[in-house]
Amino acid sequence: MMQRYRILLLSLLFLAAPLAAEAQVPTFEEVAGHAFGERITQAYQMQQYLQAVADASDRVVVEQIGTSWQGRPLMHAIVTSPENHARLDAIKANAQRLGDPRGLSDTDAERLFNEQPAIFWYGGSIHGFELSGTEGGLKMLERLTTQDDADTQRILENTVVIIDPILNPDGRDAFAYHNHDRVGQEANPDNQDWSNDFTSWEALKYRTSHYFFDINRDWFAHTHRETQARVPVLQEWRPQAGIDAHEMGANVEFYVDPPTDPVGPFFPNYATEWFERFGEAHAQGFDARGVDYMTRERFNYFYPAYTTSYLSYQGAVGMLYEQGSSRGLALTRPDGTVRTLEDALMNQYTAFEAALVLTANEREALLRDYVAAHRDAIADGEQGTRRYVLPADGGDPLMIAEVVNLLQRSGVEVNRLTAEASLRGVTDRNGDSVGNRTFAAGSYVIDAAQPRNRFIRVMLEPEVPVPQDFLEEARARVDRAENPRFYDITAWSLPLLYGIEGFSSTDGRGLASQRVEEPVTPEQPTFARAQYAYLIDGTQAAGLPALIHLKKQGYRVALLQHGTRIQGQDYAAGTGIVYAGQAEDSVHDDVRDVADRYALSVSGVNTGLAEGDRPSLGSGDVIYLKEPSVAMLAEEPIQPYSFGWAWFTLDQQYELPVSMLRVPSLRSANLSEYDTIIVPEIYGTGAMERLAGADGLERLARWVRDGGTLVTLGSGTEVARHLELIALRSWYDEEEHADSLRVSVPGAMVATSLDRNHWLAAGVPEGFRGLTNSNRLYLAPEGAPSPRQRAGVTYASGNDFAYSGHMWQESEERLPGAVFAYEERVGSGRVIAFAEDINFRAYYRGGNRLFLNAVLAGPSAP
């Protein structure tokens, strides 16, 4: 629940002649103890300033909306006139009506166009060490609470401004500590000064969240607390416009929208049209101050989970500010001039001011276009694809629930079938027509004719086509060995990411269904007390971590490599076994507890005997699991994003402990304490050898040969190849390919082929798609697979090869049949190598089971 700081006696609202705002409200310097730009404002100072302003001003309400992973407050200030504050609940209710104009009469609409202030949201410094966005937002808060000029009064009367100054307090404070520990009496603008210098690992730490996540890529998935706190705010207020204030490299001064290509086909025209108007206002503000700026370069909104693109798909004009960095307090630019933090924050402030003045002056036009855009979105949903369906039996129930819940959090209306329904014109999640299909009661239905239509389509369509003109330009850049400028992945369809079934239909007939009003949890059938064993659903990724938690409690647990049938019920490959026959009486309650914890489906059986020739529960087909001790390499030259994704997956999503080993510690650490060591993506084997030393890497190789399980992710696989632990070949190593152009796949979801006789594929859903985001091409050793050298997952080939997203022709020709996941036995140990990062952003949930199999079952596998 939001913690609210309501700050004024109501009588102050009705003073006939209020004192000047300047006399009532403290300045930023009076509270923080430094002027803007003198030091880096930390999260606690932001909190103190917001509360002090709210205590003194009738223009401000402050809310704490959550906490970061490290416990820092997530706060925003709601700024508007005292008169608007007196009717704030009505303004908020009217914002909902404008954001959902179904049932809004023309008369009521006209009244709201006349009375309703525009809602404007500002988010500062989502990348922690991009400092000026926070400072510029706080400076605007100071202006709006201490000044009474005509523009300020108009902004307060015609807008409600929500200023969220620090979107990423953990990253920001980490950088503030770095800088403040190293700065002298005066800021040193020398780029090599230690206050301005840091390693690539440190840079990502200061940019990202506690778990090394780029929160500016998390807006549709909401994996992080920071995102989870902000999404309800946007749903509650339905802003017409918003700003995401960033920094970029030092070579240029300022970027404002309109953005560059590509623009996706579902992107709202409302945002595109208003980009031009806001862009002109920004230009006028910068021209008046003589500030250099650029537009339509570098930054695009094709990917839907940037702050800006998410805002736009949610119905607002989501705008990006990119200020040239001052690194810390001052930095020397390539031309020899110095940019200070004060310079940078003034540019952010200037742009913010221009946007607010335009919003206040054009309030009615903005509201009219906003409502028209939502009516257009609803009308669009009444043609073409009419609805999307997530079948009740379409995969891991926990993953289905997560998709439904993230859609609901983003304002999407979801219904659930109360009776079986047959639909015509059905297309599956791969974009293939399946004609008519019947969906069971309990399936989830998302109708397209609703206000969040654009967001629904961009998240649930199998493919979001990249515009052809952009592809032609990108191809020319590839041929010149330049960056093609995709800027992010090109496939993110939720059914593909989460490994569940999904369908769309052109059938708009009425269905027997009921609105889903609350977050959903998978249904868990009760299970009887078992005499022999408890069997955990093999299709659920969390089943394997559940086994490890039960193993930790002292129970005997195992994993089925292949499916079986016991007492008339089928059990899939990957099914977990908890033996009850010789266990403590508490086993039933402990299994029930872990089932509740992970929303698992469990059955109790009174015999281990399988029907027919299926494997029984004591057969050689069963993998008896140990409780593995897991470590992961950390710091230089490990790629921090990859490290963070794996850490978050294990620590947060499955509550599994992992020890972090700094790469240089390979020379001295007692590796025998670990059963599994994870190597995330790396910056290069040369850096790895330099930091670990030849002796450290040899100790790692010896640990594998002595029985350890090494799990390598993406470029981390090069470590295993460098140490000659695996015979996996790179396509580019082949003599005939040595001069071939290296082309990357920009984040496509690619069809795969699973070796169902390999334990690594146990429990992995059918139709698994490999998220591919590199130019790596690995080939299995020549000759037939052997028990010691096997590819558990390869990219599909022939007619089965398919993908969502973009891929160049070279990749279409080279990728089929290449390795995605590979195992090689080395001495008494093994290497499990992934060609790509299987934990991508922790929202690639369809890959979880593969990763968990490797990490948790690898040490016990045959």
Region locations from a protein language model:
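Carboxylate/His-rich catalytic cores and anion/metal-binding grooves
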Residues: 141, 158-180
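Bacterial N-terminal signal peptides
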Residues: 8-18
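Active-site cavity-forming subdomains of large catalytic enzyme subunits
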Residues: 177-200, 220, 224-227, 239, ...
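Bacterial N-terminal signal peptides that target proteins for export
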Residues: 1-9
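Sec/Tat signal peptide C-region and signal peptidase I cleavage site
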Residues: 19-23
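Aromatic- and acidic-residue-enriched carbohydrate-binding clefts of CAZyme catalytic domains
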Residues: 193-213
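Short, solvent-exposed turn/loop segments enriched in Gly/Ser/Thr/Pro and often Arg
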Residues: 165-169, 179, 245-252, 715-716
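Intrinsic-disorder/low-complexity accessory segments
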Residues: 24-131, 138-162, 211, 217-218, ...
